[in-house]
């Protein structure tokens, strides 16, 4: 979803000859400062948190772009045997190992990497929230990877920039389930944009809050 939005955002400058009619984004990540604050507040630091796998992966990027940053200086001795595998493991494996070890934020880190990660996540943002093509935004209310409030922040900022966004909330679905679970509505959207139909969106009545 993030790649789909980023492609549409970069396209006018990078590939203006590409005719992008619409964007389907189910479970879109959004790393604005406000969204990151809300995300962190929803994750108690003293409770097991499999989402830490994303933090570990982001820290490998920090080592590449932040002079002097060393992951080992932030990760606890207890968590290091797991975290050190991140350079050779995919997210699925890291998440499973993090979950099995019941790592919490407090147990994983001996000093917080929040400032560094904030700068890293800023590099994962979209260059322009004003996107010419309309967006189908599918959100699972049970999504923990890209939670509803994160996607709501994306919608607010995209709508404020003038992007047409049509949001759909699926109350019983999580991050993985929302892709197939939204197919009926997303296919209708795709057919409409290829037919040249006007897409109104629901910026004024978002179901995401």
Kindly give the residue locations of the regions a language model identified:
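C-terminal catalytic histidine-bearing segment of alpha/beta-hydrolase fold enzymes
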Residues: 37, 109, 113-114, 118-119, ...
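Solvent-exposed loop/turn segments at secondary-structure junctions
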Residues: 1-2, 28-32, 141-145, 172-177
């Amino acid at each position: 979803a993030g790649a789909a939005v980023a492609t549409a955002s970069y396209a006018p400058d990078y590939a203006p000859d590409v005719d992008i009619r619409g964007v389907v984004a189910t479970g879109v990540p959004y790393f604005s400062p406000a969204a990151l604050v809300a995300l962190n507040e929803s994750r108690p630091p003293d409770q097991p948190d499999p989402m830490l796998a994303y933090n570990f992966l982001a820290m490998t990027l920090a080592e590449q772009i932040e002079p002097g940053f060393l992951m080992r200086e932030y990760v606890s001795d207890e968590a290091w045997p797991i975290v050190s595998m991140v350079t050779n493991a995919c997210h699925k494996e890291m998440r499973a190992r993090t979950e099995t070890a019941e790592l919490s934020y407090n147990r994983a880190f001996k000093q917080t990497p929040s400032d560094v990660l904030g700068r890293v996540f800023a590099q994962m943002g979209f260059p322009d929230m004003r996107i010419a093509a309309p967006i189908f935004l599918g959100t699972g209310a049970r999504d923990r990877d890209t939670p509803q409030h994160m996607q709501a922040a994306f919608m607010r900022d995209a709508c404020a920039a003038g992007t047409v966004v049509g949001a759909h909330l699926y109350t019983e679905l999580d991050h993985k389930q929302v892709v197939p679970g939204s197919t009926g509505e997303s296919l209708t959207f795709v057919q409409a944009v290829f037919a040249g139909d006007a897409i109104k969106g629901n910026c004024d009545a978002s179901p995401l809050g």
